[in-house]
Amino acid sequence: YTPFVRVEHGEIRKKDMREITLENNRGVQLIPQLIAPDVDKMELIIALFIEKGYKNVDINLGCPFPLLAKRHNGSGMLPYPEEVRELLTAAIKNHPDLQFSVKMRLGWENPEESLALLPLLNELPLTHIIMHPRLGKQQYKGEVDLKGFEAFYNECRHPLIYNGDLLTVEDIQTISERFPRLAGIMIGRGLLANPALALEYQQGHPLSEKDMQERLRLFHADVLDRKSVV
């Protein structure tokens, strides 16, 4: 997934356009993500995605950044179910050749907001939902709300992907065992702290210090090689 693309001062930010350029993402199955407070801005971004040849689009209903949320972007739209309905139904109705997914939080003020949206979400032909079980007003502070996530998980009829506070192999194992019907787990910030976390989970144990150093050496060499090509 790309960082979200958004409209600023009536135009798509040039930085965001660079992020989704296929030439900058060789060898990656990339899904662009958008964030928008209304249908008009969303359509401007989707038009760019279509121009670039993308067939899958992720809609961000999770960003907690206050300056965006107060304008009903990201998780700031979750308390307004009619706005969510208008945005998502327009995307699907206007673009039948595209596949849409949603990344979201439990709510802005309380987890009942996501539960109130479930009848709408369940009836839409989404490919999947990615859920970060915090409230928008928390930003990244406090604890994830696993009880709130469980309530959503139990009623969600779409493939559901968990995201949030996965920093160790044990964290990933705990979530996958507690929620066995998950379609996937999105590690996110845990990979910044430990780039080998996904590999360690696959292997079932942490890498040795020697193995980690060797893999980091190879990773850096690959980054430099790709940079020289660009």
Model-derived segments and spans:
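Hydrophobic faces of well-ordered beta-strands that scaffold small-molecule active sites
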Residues: 1-3, 30-34, 57-59, 100-104, ...
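Pocket-edge positions in alpha/beta enzyme catalytic cores
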Residues: 34, 76, 208-211
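Active-site beta-loop-alpha junctions enriched in small/polar residues
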Residues: 5-7, 35-37, 62-64, 103-109, ...
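Alpha/beta catalytic cores of nucleotide-metabolism and tRNA/nucleoside-modifying enzymes
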Residues: 90, 99, 111-128, 147, ...
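Short glycine-enriched, charge-decorated loop/helix-capping segments at active-site entrances
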Residues: 17-19, 72-78, 138, 202-203
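Alpha/beta enzyme core
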Residues: 43-57, 61-73, 82-158
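Short, charged, surface-exposed secondary-structure boundary motifs
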Residues: 10-13, 139, 194-200
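Glycine-rich, positively charged N-terminal anion/phosphate-binding segment
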Residues: 1-48
